[in-house]
């Protein structure tokens, strides 16, 4: 893991086209601004994990149900 220290209004770059800027520091919270191409998916980690879990649940289907659909 790379550790980088930034102050308010300072940025860091990921690759050539993703810029993350520290906008606000308050009460143990950090507000970040992310400038990235529109086709780049950006999710908070907790939302990413929830989506990943739902996708796993969707993969666990009863094959007998599928056999009934085939008729």
Swiss-Prot record:
Pfam families: CsrA (PF02599). GO terms for biological process: bacterial-type flagellum organization; mRNA catabolic process; negative regulation of translational initiation; regulation of bacterial-type flagellum assembly; regulation of carbohydrate metabolic process. Transmembrane segments: none annotated. Its main location: cytoplasm. GO terms for molecular function: mRNA 5'-UTR binding. GO terms for cellular component: cytosol. InterPro entries: CsrA, CsrA_sf. The keyword Cytoplasm applies. Keywords: Bacterial flagellum biogenesis, Cytoplasm, Repressor, RNA-binding, Translation regulation. It is found in: Cytoplasm. Coiled coil: none annotated. PANTHER family: CARBON STORAGE REGULATOR. Belongs to the CsrA/RsmA family. A translational regulator that binds mRNA to regulate translation initiation and/or mRNA stability. Usually binds in the 5'-UTR at or near the Shine-Dalgarno sequence preventing ribosome-binding, thus repressing translation. Its main target seems to be the major flagellin gene, while its function is anatagonized by FliW. Homodimer; the beta-strands of each monomer intercalate to form a hydrophobic core, while the alpha-helices form wings that extend away from the core. This is Translational regulator CsrA. It comes from Clostridium botulinum (strain Alaska E43 / Type E3). The lineage of its organism: Bacteria, Bacillati, Bacillota, Clostridia, Eubacteriales. The gene is csrA.
């Amino acid at each position: 893991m790379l550790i980088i220290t930034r102050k308010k209004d300072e940025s860091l770059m990921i690759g050539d086209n993703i810029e993350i800027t520290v906008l606000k520091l308050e009460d143990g919270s950090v507000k970040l601004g992310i400038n990235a191409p529109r086709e780049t998916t950006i999710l908070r980690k907790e939302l990413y994990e929830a989506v990943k879990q739902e996708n796993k649940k969707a993969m666990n289907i009863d094959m007998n149900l599928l056999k009934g659909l085939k008729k």
